[in-house]
Structure formats: C-alpha cells, structure tokens
Design a protein with these regions (language model features):
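N-terminal lobe of the biotin/lipoate ligase/transferase fold
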Residues: 2-156
Length: 156
C-alpha cells in the first residue's frame, strides 16, 4: 500500500478527527515531507483535507468520495482483503469483472463505479447508471453445484 493509500485509510477510519503531521508520520513510518506529499496528492484526487495550525490534518466530515479504504472500514474483518477496485466511471462493472474472471482471478473480486457509460442489465438491455444517482458494482463469484433455483437468488 502506498503512503497516500495508508494516509487515506487512517483518515477514513477517523473521519473528522485531526492528526498532527508528526503523529501521521510516526504511525505510517514515513517522513513529514512524505505526509505533506500524500496530503497534497489526496487533495488533487478531490478529497477535502482540512489543515489547522496546532491541530494537524483531517478528512473533512463532508468529504464524500467513494474509495476502497472508505468501503473496507465497513466490511467484516474476513472480507477486508477482497480484491476491491473503485472507479469514478467505468464502461460496465460487469464487463470488467468478466475480464478479471477470464484472467483467472479468484472469487471475491469486486468492481465498484460511481457511473457506468455502457451498463447492461438482464438480457443485455441497457442499464441507465449516471453519476450521482447510485453506486454500481459487480462481484466475481465462482459457484459450484447450484441448482437453477439457487442461481436465481444470485442473479435476481
């Protein structure tokens, strides 16, 4: 995990709480300069990171960007190591998961997008999935020995 990803995970886990640059550097085992670079990189990605003298940095409570770190904090511990990709936009999460399946990825690969430009629903019909109106995801499953009735529960 990069310093930027580690910093985002730390800030997401304690959203709204200030951390001094020194405290972050010690926790992530990096220099203060590396912390500063990671903060700026997150800001460039659109995250609202507040900085206050004698308080430090915090992820603004109003920050609402979907991220793997933000999702993982709500997952049960046994699911936190899933292969999780979050994209602002994707042609189709299902098509991307299908590509991963064809590459031999194991069950549990998840693709999440804030928008799909070519989403498909049942029978290949177009699935309208614009930005800011939902979260779209596909999960790679490799079920074995499912009856047609059980498969309906997975696909409906």
């Amino acid at each position: 995990m990069t310093t930027k990803e580690k910093l985002l995970a730390l800030l997401e886990d304690s959203k709204g709480t200030f951390f001094s640059g020194e405290e972050i550097a010690r926790t992530l085992q990096v220099s203060r300069a590396a912390v500063w670079k990671a903060v700026n990189a997150l800001r460039e990605d659109g995250y609202t990171i507040d900085a206050a003298t004698n308080k430090g940095y915090r992820l603004s409570p109003d920050s609402d960007i979907l991220s793997p770190q933000g999702i993982r904090r709500f997952l049960k511990p046994e699911y936190r190591d899933l292969d999780l990709t979050v994209l602002p936009t994707a042609p189709s999460t299902n098509a991307l998961v299908r590509e991963k399946a064809n590459q031999g990825r194991p069950e549990g690969c998840v693709i999440v997008a804030c928008e799909q430009t070519d989403g498909r629903g049942r029978y290949g019909r177009q699935f309208f999935s614009p930005i800011d109106s939902g979260v779209y995801l596909s999960l790679l499953l490799r079920p074995t020995a499912y009856s047609p009735q059980q498969a309906t529960c997975l696909t409906a």
